[in-house]
Amino acid sequence: QKQGANTLVLEYLHGLGGLSTLGMIGVYWDGFRGGYTAHIDKSVLAMAPKDHPRQPKGEGRFPADWKMEWHRKELLQAGGKLWFGVMGCGALIEGSQVKGVVVATPFGRGVILSKILIDSTGSADIAIAAGAAFDYTGKKTIAVQGAGTGKWAPGDYYNNNDWLFVDDTDILDVSRAFVQAKTKLQGQYDLVKIPQTRERRRIIGDYIISVYDVINHRRYPDTISYHKSSFDTHGMIIDPLFILNPPEKRHKIYDADVPLRCLLPKGLEGILTTGLGASAHRDAMPVIRMQPCLQNQGYAVGYLSALCVKENKSPRKIDIKKVQRHLVKIGNLPERVLTDKEFKGFSNSEMKKAIASVTDNYKGLEILLTDPERCIQLASKQIAGATMPEEKVILASILCILGQGKHAPVLAEAIRQYKDWDEGWHYT
């Protein structure tokens, strides 16, 4: 709205902020806290005097009611409109163009027309209703990140937990989670109003961020948001890299860029999808789902969308460098994004260097797995000349996970040598 575009925000709960407020996750974990997020943080805490008894102790902590009210007031003061108690339940499309959103309201169903629609449901609900392809638990794997349904006592703003698995697109499963929570939290004042989920439906966008993109610090010419976190997986992992070599401990922080094309549902125009609904592999999502980063992403998408309306262009046709210059100016993005180039893939010499080092506890595997075919060729050649049993086991494990089953006997023999289970990995 501040950029001159007519803006309507729809929210089915009674306050803004989602999991950061009514979801009782009012404390930051990791994440990049510069840019627009720094403005939010400072403004929310300035809603009361510094000596107010409810002022949080420590950084990155925000009372839920303060943050909800700041969002509401900021939106209305800028001239935007806000409808509470309204849920998006469909999309109006014409060919590949999204023209509006179907809504369920206390007064019945209706349609709101849009030039640009921002799907910040967190599970790509509107984009998927419009026909966007998506990925989620159940199609290829049963892996899902742990979730919770926390208590809510007067004055609370942080009750983070991880004790259940829930499909928040299934109303029966969500109902089951709340029934279960009422039993688990019997005697508490109240419960959160939305399931505290960490994994949801993700669009198939113009590009899909991979684990390798994050670990290899891939850069893009169309970066729209900057992220910092660890592979805090809260559950099973499925990427071949992590099956062979589990993620490093929680304290290992990665920085990752998210390009605009990961917010654009493939084959659709006039819509962007933010947050946990973005186009990324599920194992990469923990690094790009931190609240501070997504607040900056929300600002960036809002700014870009307003520009699209003013210039009568689609998000794919907008001058991304113009958007980036503004985001760099306010601190959302590092200045390097203005000159970042498209990644062309690793060279043959880089791949050969990686295969030479991979027998040292899988060092360089994140490079090799970016190109499975070349990896198979190099590993097959390497294992043929390997003499050390430990090297053969590592190379055989790589080949087997890429479908080269003839090397399975090497792994079977190695497994037989173990008398006990290892300590495993506590992934919650």
Regions from the PLM with identified roles:
Residues 1-5, 129:
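Alpha-helix C-terminal capping segments
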Residues 5-6, 10-90, 94, 135, ...:
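Conserved N-terminal/central alpha/beta ligand/cofactor-binding core
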Residues 13, 60-64, 68, 287, ...:
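Solvent-exposed, acidic/flexible segments
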Residues 40-44, 68, 85, 89, ...:
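Flavin (FAD/FMN)-binding glycine-rich loop and adjacent Rossmann-like elements that form
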Residues 77, 106, 341-376, 390-391:
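Amphipathic heptad-repeat coiled-coil/leucine-zipper-like oligomerization helices
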Residues 360-373, 381-385, 390-404, 423-428:
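Structural detector for internal amphipathic alpha-helices that build alpha-solenoid repeat scaffolds
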